[in-house]
Amino acid sequence: MKLVLAIVVILMLLSLSTGAEMSDNHASRSATALRDRLLSPKASICYGTGGRCTKDKHCCGWLCCGGPSVGCVVSVAPCK
């Protein structure tokens, strides 16, 4: 959670440093969209290795769900 907040603060500072006159610029819009997506209540949280899961989408990156008793695991093959 602290990492997400740090990223949001950095993005906000970067958007402020570009100046208000450039607010229609693509980078500024991207930073705003990312900030909104990260802070929205719909932002999903993924779990790392061993994290509790019931579906592959609950696991971060290339991790797959091995079931509630196993948790998120590294997989060489794509998740099902």
From Swiss-Prot:
Family: Belongs to the conotoxin I3 superfamily.
Tagged with keyword ATP-binding: no
Residues of the propeptide: 20-42
Compartmental location: Secreted
Protein name: Conotoxin Ca11.3
Naturally occurring in which organism (per UniProt): Conus caracteristicus (Characteristic cone)
Origin superkingdom: Eukaryota
Intrachain disulfide bonds: C46-C60, C53-C65, C59-C72, C64-C79
InterPro entries: Conotoxin
